[in-house]
UniProtKB/Swiss-Prot annotation:
This is Zinc finger CCCH domain-containing protein 23. It holds the Pfam family RRM_1. Gene3D superfamilies: 3.30.1370.210, 3.30.70.330. Residues 359-435 form the RRM domain. Keywords: Coiled coil, DNA-binding, Metal-binding, RNA-binding, Zinc, Zinc-finger. Residues 480-513 form a coiled coil. A zinc finger (C3H1-type) spans 228-255.
């Protein structure tokens, strides 16, 4: 069954019980709008539940019960009514009537109302129900007077009366204790917006999360001005449009300065009070979960309107502050920062962030000084705002650093000069310098120089120097990112220096190994040469003379035979060993080494005929024996076979190893005396 069919069933049941007032009772139930589930519950509920609902509606509408209904069916008291007043239908457990939760009436009637005024007041206090007419007790006293209920306008409070006008056809039958009576400002007394003292300032009213009806603005809340009109501004007119026009009870025009200031303050106070009440209203159902308002939602629209108003006022306040700051910047110049809440960042601040050294100074002072960092800050605050003072905690402190907010303060202090006296201590001020500036001479002393003393002749000063690069890059920077960059550069520099040292060491070891190989080869060749027998070697390529010979001394156990060099018969010469005894002084020490072989090489393998003739006509004889004489010998053929195997002076078991093997194309003589290759 849907809500429409349930409504028809409920109306038919009410019409069967009370046909005279069925339309009014049904209209009240529809206006209250308890939900579809509650309507279905009334349609299928017992007769006692329907009688209790009808009796409660008659009390609210001030209707007399029909005589047959009073005699036939007893009504259930309102205090024991199981009817659940819930807008969200979140629970099905019955709740007692809100009459037991009713508060005292906020209105105190005067004695001019007649003798029945006290009795009517007592009846009204005893029959306080959830009605759009009586407002649910003290809710009207706590409602904000100038803010709409549930997001509606202020004049929308009377729309409910217009909707319920058809319910009050008979004016004579209305109970004066339940009817809404009009009171002027002199006949009523109502508490102010902030005079509510309960945890639930809205009471226990269920309609729209607040009071069912709100009274008109009272005199003490309207704040009448001297001309008799209220100076409260119209919020709708301030936003651009007011539907009431000239008949609006609030001011649409401009206000005086004092009135506008008071109005703004009052609006802010009302907004804050309303937000506090809405917060307590949200906390109230949590504290009393079984109250009729335990499941009622709060009014988000009114809260959002108050928040929007507060945000708008805050934005206007910020705009005013910006305008004042701009005026101070234009008029005051450098002194504007003294009147502002906090200094704003400009180009100078960004430059000082990139170059923190421009905002710092370096202090030097005697070691026996007794001043503290606070004393230094108080002294230099005369020149400008001080950001930080750093003095190292040492036994003999002699230096410190002061950081200012503006770099102009540093320029002013440096321009003043030295000395400064802080607590009778002489303090010298110097400009701050970055650590990255390393002089070249210290860097050269720290770096090794192996260009001349190295055995390999290598220059160790390779281009792996990152100090100068890092000094240039980090000269005007001290931020976190640049500190990380500095660390990376240092790590790269250390890695490069380590690699450089490894390369130099490996190259130096390679050079030493090459030198060891050369020296060992030379020593081995010399040792093998001294073990062999002596052989006369004709050094015709270097000396150029036919008779020049190189003689190597032989041991005394030689055989005494001679070896003669052959030449032409016309140019043969006898060399006397006795006359040439002093020729032994011309013996070279490195005759058998590889250097001598290199020097004996001709300039060209194709030698001229004159040099070849001079070489083959030169004769030399060596006689080794007891007499020690050199004799002449016949010519012999010098060839590879004669030197290698036909030499009678060489022992057959010894070979002379040569450190180098070279091929020499030697010329030979023909039978006719011509030289052939």
């Amino acid at each position: 069954m849907d809500a429409y069919e349930a409504t028809k069933v409920v109306f038919s049941r009410i019409q069967a019980l009370d046909p005279d007032h069925a339309a009014k009772i049904m209209g009240l139930l529809l206006i209250q709008d308890h939900g579809d589930k509650e309507m279905i519950r009334l349609a299928f509920g017992p007769e006692a539940l329907l009688h209790s609902v009808m009796a409660q509606a008659r009390k609210e509408l001030a209707l007399l019960p029909p005589p047959q209904a009073a005699s036939s069916s007893p009504t259930v008291p309102a205090a024991h009514s199981p009817f659940l007043l819930s807008r969200q239908n979140s629970g099905r457990c019955p709740a007692p009537s809100p009459s037991s939760w009713a508060q005292a009436q906020p209105f105190s009637r005067s004695n001019s109302m007649g003798n029945g005024g006290a009795a009517d007041e007592m009846v009204g206090a005893g029959e306080e129900l959830m009605s759009p007419l009586n407002g649910g007790g003290g809710a009207a006293a706590n409602a904000p007077p100038f803010f709409p209920r549930g997001g509606d306008a202020l004049l929308d409070d009377f729309e409910l009366q217009e909707q319920l006008a058809f319910l009050h056809d008979g004016a004579g039958g209305v109970n004066p204790g339940h009817a809404l009576q009009a009171f002027d400002g002199a006949e009523c007394r109502s508490p102010g917006p902030g005079e509510s003292g309960g945890m639930l300032p809205y009471g226990l009213a269920w309609a729209n999360g607040g009071p069912g009806h709100r009274r008109s603005a009272s005199v003490n809340e309207l704040c009448l001005g001297g001309d008799g009109f209220g100076w409260k501004p119209c919020l709708y007119y301030a936003r651009g449009f007011c539907k009431n026009g000239s008949t609006c009870r609030f001011v649409h025009g401009g206000l005086s300065d004092d009135a506008a200031m008071d109005a703004t303050t009052a609006e802010q106070q009302q907004c804050q009070d309303f937000l506090l009440r809405s917060k307590s209203q949200r906390l109230g159902p949590a504290a009393f979960p079984f109250t009729p308002t335990g499941s009622l939602p709060a009014s988000p629209s009114a809260t959002s309107k108050c928040l929007s108003l507060l945000l708008q006022q805050q934005q206007q306040h910020n705009d005013n502050q910006r305008a004042a700051a701009a005026a101070l910047m234009l008029a005051g110049g450098d002194e504007a920062h003294k009147f502002m809440g906090r200094p704003r960042l400009d180009r100078v601040d960004f430059a000082s962030m990139m170059n923190p050294g421009s905002r710092q100074i370096y202090l030097t002072f005697p070691a026996d000084s007794t001043f503290r960092e606070e004393d230094v800050s108080n002294y230099f605050s005369i020149y400008g705002p001080v950001h930080d003072v750093r003095i190292p905690y040492q036994q003999k402190r002699m230096f410190g650093f002061v950081t200012f907010v503006y770099p102009e303060t540093v320029k002013l202090i440096l321009a003043k000069g030295n000395p400064h006296f802080i607590c009778d201590a002489r303090v010298l001020v110097k400009p701050y310098k970055e650590k990255g500036k390393v002089p070249d001479k210290y860097r050269k002393q720290q770096q090794g120089d192996f260009c001349c003393m190295s055995p390999t002749g290598l220059d160790a000063r390779d281009p792996f120097d990152f100090h100068q690069l890092g000094a240039r890059m980090l000269q005007h920077s001290n931020s976190a990112n640049e500190l990380m960059l500095r660390r990376k550069l240092e790590e790269q520099q250390q890695a490069a220096e380590l690699q450089q040292a490894i390369d130099l060491h490996s190259r130096r070891l390679i050079g030493l190994q090459l030198l060891d190989l050369k020296s060992s080869a030379a020593v081995h060749a010399a040792e093998t040469t001294t073990m062999s027998l002596p052989t006369p070697i004709t050094n015709a390529f270097t000396s150029g003379q036919p008779g020049a010979t190189t003689i190597v001394e032989s041991p005394p156990s030689s055989t005494g035979q001679l070896m003669a060099s052959c030449g032409s018969p016309s140019e043969g010469k006898v060399v006397n060993g006795g006359n040439k005894a002093d020729s032994a002084g011309e013996v070279t020490r490195n005759a058998d080494s590889d250097q001598s072989g290199e020097h004996n090489l001709p300039d060209s393998p194709f030698a001229s005929s004159t040099k070849s003739t001079a070489f083959f006509t030169a004769t030399a004889a060596t006689a080794i024996g007891s007499e020690g004489d050199f004799t002449t010998g016949s010519s012999c053929n010098i060839g590879g076979s004669a030197v290698g195997s036909a030499n009678p002076l060489r022992p057959p078991t010894l070979d002379i190893p040569s450190p180098r093997t070279c091929f020499f194309p030697m010329p030979r003589l023909s039978e006719h005396g011509a030289i052939g290759m």
